[in-house]
Amino acid sequence: FSDMERIAEEGYYEMVNMRLSKCGGFRNSLKMIDYLRDHGISFQVGCQLGESGLLSAAGRALSLLCSDAVYYDGSYDEFLLQENVTLEHVSFGPGGEAGPLKGHGLGVEISHRNLERLRDPSTAVTMSRP
């Protein structure tokens, strides 16, 4: 969050690219966006290149909460990924149109078969309850 404060204090930025995956999730993203709004700094809802359908769906939800964003970026998964971890395609439609996704939560279901096949076992973390 200190980056946002520095950006506001220095006054060098007219717009900030807000990426849900870089900001620590919904709560932090919305907190930072509110801070930008309070300081008169424009923002766009951005994305990471090659996001899966799950992150695209999350970005879509954030975009729908931020009608004052200057630009919306994301939902490229169908155009960039050979395989996805979601059952639904969440890529934008003709003219870049992308509205709310139907269904519960983020509006997507995970393909457990694809997730298992696409995961990188070398990065797996084992967690146990205390």
Where are these regions (language model features)?
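C-terminal extensions of enzymes
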Residues: F79-P130
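Shared catalytic-loop signature of beta/alpha-barrel
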Residues: F1-E97
